[in-house]
Regions:
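N-terminal carbohydrate-binding accessory modules
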Residues: 25-104
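Acidic (Asp/Glu)-rich catalytic clusters
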Residues: 94-101, 133-138, 194-196, 321-326, ...
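Aromatic-lined substrate-binding rim segments of carbohydrate-active enzymes
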Residues: 91-166, 286-294
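Short, acidic/polar
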Residues: 86-99, 184-190, 312-324, 385-393, ...
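Hydrophobic faces of well-ordered beta-strands that scaffold small-molecule active sites
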Residues: 80-84, 105-107, 143-147, 202-206, ...
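The substrate-binding groove and active-site-proximal loops of carbohydrate-active enzymes
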Residues: 78-87, 108-126, 166-185, 207-214, ...
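Carbohydrate-binding surfaces of carbohydrate-active enzymes
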Residues: 5-53, 76-78, 339-666
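Polysaccharide-binding and catalytic clefts of secreted carbohydrate-active enzymes
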Residues: 166-352
Length: 666
């Protein structure tokens, strides 16, 4: 206890000193800015703000809504929503948030609030929500409601003991049983009608960090057998594909993820992964359909953890980006990007945002809403520079995020709390959120052009490769993605399911990242691809089907060397850059260091637009760089963030500094 007390006092003192230093910097800067403004040497940019009068409509990656600039009428334009979640403090501070530069919150309630007892229905949570929506509308703050099916009434578990199932994650009851489904549908029928038409209700988040890991039950077993019959048609076809000898579908067990015998690297395990993904998406669709039966135009999404969308170790959790997009009007997620404190080659964990964002945008061109944006670790005691916050939020937006609520707006003296060390303890970080939101909204029409860049290349995202090839596949994919990012290439993904449906991307290149396995139907579709196939790896790739059966047929293509455990992303980058030109992939600009060598660590994207050529730059390195931009478009640029005319040689970039340039000719 004495140790804890001393540690707590040290932590509180350090936090106070950080905050004082931050606020002194803010005060001194503001004094200088006001002095310049008074002398006519500085003009603060005008920022359009969402009026709160109409719910945004969705156009591609954008939320389009009425926004008003001071002394001007409101007009429809792209609006970015940046704010906070998730509990009592965001409710209390709604009226303060516009002055902090933010315009959205996420809050929640669940079935237990509506059904506290078996024979009681309470409308208290609905009344509180309506009051919050009214307050938010007055000040132009949007509200995302997480309907939290994980807040499930205990009396239901007592009344229906079979709902008690061993599970992972927030949803801790049997999802397959009809009793749990019926309660959730009744819950939706009660809460949606009084809320659905409020303009401040931005959207509905269906679930919090969903995963479907459950011990088998009779209902899941029944659904499993139905799915197998629909997929294979007859048991002899299944036996041929699996290399098995079952006499009927009913004989096939449903895998138990908690069993010591659980193994997805079998034909049965492969099909279980696909079944679990499709079933869980269908369960979400049940909730979405119930909402849309009452409110057809109310957007919904789910807060899927991005690593469950991309990771090989998470492929069996039931979460699939493409299937989740099918019931969503917004690509929802929960994503992580932490400051590195100088450890490693990059200043922040950027790939954890950008790669899954590109995946989500590839399966459905709708806005991304990261409704639990982890940009500061829980209980973080170290200082976080505001540049980390600014870079993370800006780049997330550039890659398609048009709404986000940051975890977490709360303050505490309890070191064990998730709120310890949160952004509410960090004045310059909180200020950075507001400034980024202002910049995104005043430049929203430019940022939208960057968001709309069409992929120039595609990478295959394959469940078969995730199951059978594991880290050999994901390691290559991550390194390839990194190399392409620092080559100025807009990256897309094509999924195995898309290929199976014959949806072949209209692009010049498809990359195959060290994957031996792909489904037979996807393989056949690749034969019809008109562009160039680039194989990244040494071994014979695409040599087996989804059930690990050897494939005699082969695909030919270009090859990049990759050896698992040896090849770095820089190795791929060095060999990739010159070959991209040969393959017809040439960004409008090239980035070099001050010695005219290719420069790694600076992510850049270019968009030819009606305004001119836009260039977005972000320095992910731990050190300042001086770069040169080579372009045919012009010899200088306007930095749209600072509204300054700048030279393209040299162009300094501090760690985690972002720039949005508009190229100009002299």
């Amino acid at each position: 206890l004495d140790y804890y007390k001393d540690k707590k006092e040290i932590w509180i003192l350090r936090r106070a000193l950080f905050a004082i230093e931050d606020m002194e910097k803010m005060l001194n800067r503001l004094k200088n800015e006001l002095k310049k403004a008074k002398a006519g040497k500085l003009h603060f940019p005008k920022v359009p703000r969402w009026t709160g009068e109409e719910r945004p409509i969705i156009e591609g990656p954008s939320f389009i809504a009425p926004a008003k600039t001071p002394n001007s009428p409101s007009r429809m334009r792209p609006v970015f929503f940046n704010g906070y979640g998730a509990f009592d403090q965001v409710k209390a501070d709604i009226e303060k948030f516009p002055n902090y530069g933010v315009n959205i919150i996420q809050i929640e309630f669940g079935p237990v609030d509506i059904f506290p007892k078996e024979d009681e229905v309470s409308d208290s949570a609905i009344k509180e929500m309506l009051t919050i929506l009214d307050r938010a509308k007055k000040v132009g703050v949007a509200v995302n409601l997480l309907i939290s099916p994980h807040y499930f009434p205990k009396w239901m578990l007592e009344k229906y003991p079979h709902l008690r199932k061993k599970r992972e994650g927030f949803l801790d009851y049997c999802l397959h049983a009809p009793e749990s489904k019926e309660l959730l549908l009744r819950y939706i029928k009660i809460i949606i009608p009084p809320l659905k038409d409020h303009p401040s209700l931005h959207s509905i988040c269906l679930t919090n960090e969903p995963v479907n890991v459950e011990e088998p039950c009779e209902y899941a077993l029944r659904d499993w057998h139905i799915w197998l019959a629909q997929k294979h048609g007859d048991i002899s076809t299944l036996n041929r594909r699996w290399g098995s000898n079952y006499s009927s579908f009913e004989e096939i067990p449903l895998p138990n993820p908690f069993s010591s015998l659980y193994d997805i690297q079998t034909p049965l395990g492969m099909d279980y992964v696909l079944f679990n993904q499709e079933w869980f998406a269908g369960w979400h669709k049940m909730l979405a359909d119930a909402i849309h039966e009452i409110a057809p135009d109310l957007p919904v999404h789910a807060k899927a953890m991005t690593w469950t969308l991309t990771g090989t170790g998470e492929v069996d959790l039931g979460v699939d980006a493409e299937l989740f997009s099918s019931f969503s009007q917004i690509n929802g997620n929960d994503s992580v990007n932490f400051y590195s404190h100088g450890v490693g080659e990059f200043a922040q964990g950027w790939i954890g945002n950008l790669l899954p964002y590109d995946l989500q945008r590839s399966v459905k061109d709708i806005p991304i809403f990261n409704s639990e944006n982890h940009i500061i670790p829980d209980r973080e005691a170290r200082y976080i520079p505001p540049a980390h916050i600014r870079c993370a939020l800006w780049q997330q937006a550039v890659y398609g995020q048009s709404a986000t609520t940051i975890w977490i707006w709360g303050r505490t003296y309890d070191l064990r709390s998730d709120s310890a060390g949160s952004i509410m303890h960090r004045p310059l970080c909180a200020e950075a959120v507001g400034i980024v939101n202002y910049d995104l909204n005043r430049l929203s029409e430019y940022v939208r052009e960057i968001q709309r860049i069409k992929p120039q290349v595609h990478i295959i995202m394959s469940n078969s490769a995730k199951v059978w090839d594991g880290g050999h596949y994901s390691d290559c994919l991550d390194k390839l993605y990194t190399a392409l990012t620092f080559s100025g290439v807009k990256i897309g993904f094509v999924t195995e399911r898309q290929l199976e449906r014959g949806e072949i991307p209209q692009t010049k290149i498809i990359f195959i990242p060290n994957m031996a396995h792909i489904s037979d139907r996807a393989f056949e579709a690749l034969k019809n691809f008109k562009g160039k196939i680039v194989i990244v790896g040494e071994v014979e790739l695409l040599s087996k089907n989804e059930y690990d059966q050897k494939r005699e047929d082969k695909l030919t293509g270009e090859r990049l060397i990759y050896r698992y455990g040896e090849t770095t992303w820089q190795d791929i980058w060095s060999s990739l850059r010159p070959r991209l030109r040969d393959w017809g992939i040439q960004p409008p600009i090239e980035v070099f260091d001050n010695k005219s060598r290719p420069l790694w660590g600076v992510a850049f994207l270019c968009a030819p637009t009606k305004y001119g050529t836009l260039v977005n730059l972000s320095n992910y390195r731990n050190e300042r760089v001086e770069l040169k931009l080579r372009t045919k478009e012009g010899s200088f640029a306007i930095d749209l963030l600072s509204n300054e005319k700048i030279s393209l040689d040299p162009l300094p970039l501090n760690p985690l500094e972002v720039r949005l340039l508009l190229l100009k000719k002299r």
